[in-house]
UniProtKB/Swiss-Prot annotation:
Entry keywords, A to Z: Hydrolase, Magnesium, Metal-binding
Enzyme class: hydrolase
Cofactor or coenzyme needed: Mg(2+)
GO molecular function terms attached to this record: metal ion binding; phosphatase activity
This protein's name: Glyceraldehyde 3-phosphate phosphatase
Alphabetical GO biological process terms: small molecule biosynthetic process
Function: Catalyzes the dephosphorylation of D,L-glyceraldehyde 3-phosphate in vitro.
Gene3D superfamilies named among the record's database cross-references: 1.10.150.520, HAD superfamily/HAD-like (3.40.50.1000)
Native species: Methanothermobacter thermautotrophicus (strain ATCC 29096 / DSM 1053 / JCM 10044 / NBRC 100330 / Delta H)
Length: 226
């Protein structure tokens, strides 16, 4: 019988990608109005390239953007971009429609809930607090804190250790096959893929290796299967 349910945060509990895209475009519009000599399409393409190269947790994307365009950093444009990005993102931030009710349901059934996330500890806690769901989780384990990123099994093993739970009595819920699903199953856990679909190659891997993987369209389906 399952005892613990672990969740990824981004694009699992809330629409990270959608909110970030809106916030980035709003920030670029403000920077363009203040003198960035690019169209929004050009600026967004460049920003996406920078994010792809540096990673989403890098905190100087706008610094790199202005240095690329001007040959030097432009503090005013950087500050305008950062302020707008954070203001818009936090104004929009909310869980997926069925996230909170699902967490309530799982807690009422006696499950212990945890988070396993690649990211900076304070930033991940800030997301959970702003989403209004931090109090549901018994443990929040981040790559920043433990020194290993998903899919490395050591971050899953550390989460299980803190929760005091065996892998066969735990399940990981996430939207990324390589990070969440493979990482969890390699650690001996079952896994549930949400807000995504298995590719043919991923499905073949699951079947060939006899992995305990379930695919759902919406987080609310956890109420039925757990």
């Amino acid at each position: 019988m399952l005892k613990a349910v672990f969740f990824d945060i981004d694009d699992t509990l809330y629409d990270t990608s959608g909110f970030a895209k809106l916030a980035r475009k709003a920030a670029l519009n403000v920077m363009i109005d203040a003198g960035l000599p690019l169209t929004q399409e050009e600026a967004y393409k460049l920003l996406r390239e920078i994010i792809s190269e540096k990673g989403s947790n890098y905190d100087r994307h706008f610094n790199v953007l202005t240095k690329t365009v001007f040959g030097e950093e432009k503090p005013l444009l950087i500050a305008l971009g950062m302020i707008t990005y954070h203001n818009v993102k936090f104004a929009l931030l909310r869980p997926f429609p069925n996230t909170t009710s699902t967490l309530i349901d799982l807690k009422s059934k006696g499950y212990r809930l945890g988070v396993i996330s690649n990211g900076i500890t304070i930033k991940q806690w800030e997301k959970l607090i702003r989403l209004g769901i931090h109090h549901f989780f018994d443990e929040v384990v981040t790559s920043d804190e433990v020194g290993f990123e998903k899919p490395n099994i050591r971050i899953f093993e550390e989460a299980l250790r803190r929760m005091g739970c065996k892998p066969e009595r735990s399940v990981m819920v996430g939207n990324k096959f390589n990070e969440d699903i493979l990482g969890a199953t390699n650690a001996g856990m079952s896994a549930i893929l949400v807000n995504s679909e298995l590719t043919e190659a991923e499905r073949d891997h699951v079947e060939k290796n006899g992995l305990d993987v379930t695919v759902i369209d919406d987080i609310s389906q956890l109420k039925e299967i757990l």
